[in-house]
Design a protein with these regions (language model features):
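Acidic metal-coordinating catalytic centers involved in nucleic-acid phosphodiester chemistry
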Residues: 1-12, 62-129
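Catalytic centers of nucleases
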Residues: 5, 12-13, 17-79
């Protein structure tokens, strides 16, 4: 057999490699008392001395554009809000994706707006659907 199968192990290996690179980058920036964990509560967790300084990173490797209705964004939020996940242990949820923002995506300003504006943006997207 020549070529790659749809479920090639290479894709899984590359995804984990990407997680390790993101985690390694965070390792170089660790402060006293902080730790990095892989696949603890999600893809990469930075646990600090208090919950507000801890962060949970979901690392995604997608080639299509990140649009307002993209499953990647909404599935990440859904998982974070599951009753069995204790999001109170983390001050931040970061979606670290290889996706470019879609041209008409209202999410494209996500990284420059505050928490209240993000919540309002989510409400607006939900009200359109």
């Amino acid at each position: 057999m020549c070529g790659k199968t749809k479920n090639s192990a290479l894709i899984t290996a590359l995804a984990f490699h990407y997680q390790v690179l993101v985690g390694l980058d965070k390792c170089f920036k660790l402060k006293e008392g902080e730790s990095i964990f892989f696949e603890k509560d999600g893809d990469v967790s930075l646990v600090g001395q208090n919950d507000s300084s801890s962060l949970q990173m979901e690392i995604k490797n997608y080639s299509d554009s990140l649009t307002d209705n993209h499953l990647n964004f909404w599935k990440t939020l859904k998982n974070w809000l599951q009753p069995e996940f204790n999001q109170a242990k983390y001050g931040y949820l970061i979606l670290h994706t290889t996706q470019p923002f879609g041209v008409s995506s209202t999410l494209k300003n996500w990284n420059t707006i505050d928490i209240e504006e993000r919540l309002e943006l989510i409400r607006k997207i939900c009200s359109k659907n």
